[in-house]
Each structure stands twice: as structure tokens, then as C-alpha cells.
């Protein structure tokens, strides 16, 4: 279960390097450098061996494509707040909400892929948003570049709980740029939490030589262990 990992992630030195400076907005977007994942599966079955490709318009050749180089719309923040001056709620549905979390699902034409905007409420005025893609029992989450926003440790812990308890995924994949200054710290921290480095060519991740992927597999209790 992920519970034992959550305490470690709250105390990890990686998430301790949070911003303590100016806060330009009450809503913080946690995808500052890597654009939205757009993930499409090849094959109809949801299994660990299902192959996944992540598409974008920056690569016009065949094979997996991911992360557009062109500007993308800001996150769809409930209530129409944030960096956007327009209310994007018309293209998103409320998926889940509790006292800590508000999750909207973007409407897409692909019924095998689901795109979520996850907003964790740290205080009444402080929110942090993550964008994630759900496909074939896998959740793909981007780790932003630079220092993580203040409160990211609590926000990410809530996101992991949501992935396990509400989405019931088998794996959570994180990705971040290889050339970031704290890459070594991220690798150590997430390895300690149970994440493993995903080698190039893995069927569940796209071909991205500039990105590092790590995977966490949730441990499910069997019926025999529960007795």
C-alpha cells in the first residue's frame, strides 16, 4: 500500500526545496515546463503489458509523440480562476471532490484515455494543480521543473492517495527533464519511495530522450493475506 510511502514523501529532501518567496497567485500550476500529456493506447485491453504512446504535434513522424512545443491552454481551474481569463469549465466535468481535492476530467474523443486536472486544497486560498493522464490502469504525472511550489509535498501525497483509492491504478509514472539541476535528488528520493527508473524502450512509456521516467507499482493485498 502507498500509506507507508506517503510519510516518507512528506519528509523527503526533494520536496523540502519548496519556494518560500513571493506567491503571485493563490492557485499554483504544477506543470510549468512540460505541457499536457495526451496519451493514446494501442490495443483494446487494459493490462500491464499494454503498449502506450503519448502524442503531440512536435513530432510529425511515426511512433510515440509527446509534449508539444507550441503554447497550450492554461489549466482548467474550477471557478474560472488562475492564469486564464476565461472559464474553461464548459469543456470539463467534475470527477471527484472532497475537503482536500477537486478533480475535473477534460472531455476528449478518446474513450480509452482520460485527462484529469487535479486541484488539491492546502488552504481556503492556496491551491496546487497537477495534470495527469489515465490509460490502461496507469496514471502519468509530470513533475515540474525548478523548485516545486510551496505545499507540493502535501499536494503530491494527496494525489497518490487519490490514484490508489479512487482510480485504483496499478502504476503511477512520473516524468521530469533529465537536464534539471535536482535530477539526482529526484532519483534518490523517488527510488527511496519505491519508484523504479523506467529504461528506454519500455512499452508503457514514450520515446523521450530528454525525459526521465520512473514508475511506482501499488501492492495489492490478496484475498489470502486478508484472511
UniProtKB/Swiss-Prot annotation:
**InterPro entries attached here?**
Acyl_CoA_acyltransferase, ODC_AZ, ODC_AZ_sf
Q: Where is this region: Disordered?
A: 20-50
Per the UniProt record, one Pfam family is: ODC_AZ
Q: What SUPFAM superfamilies does the record tag this protein with?
A: Acyl-CoA N-acyltransferases (Nat)
Cleaved signal peptide residues: none
- Quaternary form? Interacts with ODC1 and thereby sterically blocks ODC homodimerization. Forms a ternary complex with PSMB4 and OAZ1 before PSMB4 is incorporated into the 20S proteasome. Interacts with AZIN2; this interaction disrupts the interaction between the antizyme and ODC1. Interacts with FAM171A1.
Listed A to Z, the keywords are: Polyamine biosynthesis, Transport
Membrane-crossing ranges are none
Show the GO MF annotations: ornithine decarboxylase inhibitor activity
Q: What does this protein do?
A: Ornithine decarboxylase (ODC) antizyme protein that negatively regulates ODC activity and intracellular polyamine biosynthesis and uptake in response to increased intracellular polyamine levels. Binds to ODC monomers, inhibiting the assembly of the functional ODC homodimer, and targets the monomers for ubiquitin-independent proteolytic destruction by the 26S proteasome. Triggers ODC degradation by inducing the exposure of a cryptic proteasome-interacting surface of ODC. Stabilizes AZIN2 by interfering with its ubiquitination.
Family per record = Belongs to the ODC antizyme family.
Q: Is Transport tagged as a keyword?
A: yes
One annotated Gene Ontology cellular component of this protein: cytoplasm
Protein name from the UniProt record: Ornithine decarboxylase antizyme 1
Task: Report the record's Gene Ontology biological process terms.
Answer: polyamine biosynthetic process; positive regulation of intracellular protein transport; positive regulation of protein catabolic process; viral translational frameshifting
Low complexity bias locations = 36-50
